[in-house]
Regions:
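Auxiliary Fe-S-binding modules of radical SAM enzymes
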Residues: 1-42, 198-277
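Solvent-exposed alpha-helices and their adjacent loops that cap or buttress functional pockets
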Residues: 27-28, 44-47, 96, 146-147
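Short, conserved loop/turn and helix-capping segments at secondary-structure boundaries
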Residues: 78, 170-173, 256-259
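Short glycine-enriched, charge-decorated loop/helix-capping segments at active-site entrances
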Residues: 69-73, 166-172, 246-254
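Conserved AdoMet/S-adenosylmethionine-binding subsite of the radical SAM
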Residues: 85, 89-101, 105-106, 110-243
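Canonical Radical SAM [4Fe-4S] cluster-binding loop centered on the CxxxCxxC motif
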Residues: 37-79
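Non-heme iron-sulfur electron-transfer modules
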Residues: 24-31, 71-89
């Protein structure tokens, strides 16, 4: 039998393993996250001026995604909680002066829910408004303590019909609907967002299903969780990003919705006495 040599790992390998262990621990504790980018915007991702962080990673593959470069968690920039909170503190005075705050978007921020929760906790500790921009697909991952630190949810409802939702995202509709109901029962304020894509999400029965769902949310909790519905017209501004990541863009030849179509869809929501933008 040949001799078996039990060699001690080299110092370099040991150091690498220690660093990897420390990194994984930091991720689990929410001390380290993967960030795609950040920006200061006004009246887009919530009220007032917002410091919006786009976290990397998403479980959906929406056909109309304008940020496909956020899909992969490893592609983001490793960012410490301290780096994020330092920037928040730097802009806090401006954000407060405009009645704005901090928004976490993506990607899907709930894929990094521990990191996101730590950020929201810091915001609340210094009196800043918080908003979560999410599909709601991973809503079951977060507990009530997480939601206690969220002042507004921008809930992206991609479709009202399961088959259309599956076609658009590659996933199931039910988790999003359940998360919306949970928010409504808690009384968490919501802006419902709906991306209108001709020949994909514009069918009358699909819009009716979304509108019925949103109306049903108003019968839960305090009856006033949904503050507005935003109809977002499809656009082609994300085309270059699809090309940059080497993915064929399935909606390359799709045109934005006409004014007539936009008004028809807005009218379907207004018919249920919902505030529509």
């Amino acid at each position: 039998m040949p001799a078996i040599t039990l060699e001690m790992p080299s110092i370099g390998h040991r150091r690498h393993d220690d660093q990897r262990t420390a990194r994984l621990h930091a991720v689990r504790e929410g001390d380290l996250g993967s960030v795609h980018s950040w920006e200061l915007v006004t009246a887009v991702d919530g009220p007032g001026t917002r410091l919006t962080y786009f976290l990397s990673g998403c479980t959906l593959r929406c056909l109309y995604c304008q940020n496909p470069d956020t899909w992969r968690l490893p592609d983001g920039i490793p960012t410490t909680l301290g780096e994020v909170t330092d920037r928040i503190d730097h802009y806090a005075a401006v954000l407060k002066a405009t009645h704005g705050g901090v928004t976490l978007s993506g990607g899907e921020p709930l894929l990094q829910h521990t990191f996101a929760g730590r950020i929201f906790r810091h915001c609340q500790s210094i009196g800043l408004h918080t908003a979560l921009d999410t599909s709601g697909y991973l809503g079951a991952r977060v507990d009530d303590a997480f939601l206690d630190d969220v002042n507004l949810v921008l809930l992206d409802v991609k479709s009202g019909l399961p088959e259309t939702y599956k076609k658009v995202t590659g996933r199931e509709l039910a988790p999003t609907l359940a998360f919306g109901r949970r928010l409504a029962e808690r009384g968490t304020p919501m802006w419902i967002r709906y991306v209108l894509v001709p020949d994909l999400t514009d069918a009358v029965d699909n819009i009716e299903a979304v509108a019925d769902y949103v109306q049903s949310l108003q019968s839960l909790g305090d009856g006033d969780a949904v503050k507005r519905v935003e109809i977002l017209p499809f656009h082609q501004m994300g085309t270059s990003k699809w090309k940059a990541i080497g993915e064929p863009y399935p909606l390359e030849n799709t045109k934005p919705p006409s004014k007539k179509l936009l008004e028809r869809v807005r009218g379907q929501f207004r018919a249920r006495e919902l505030t529509v933008f």
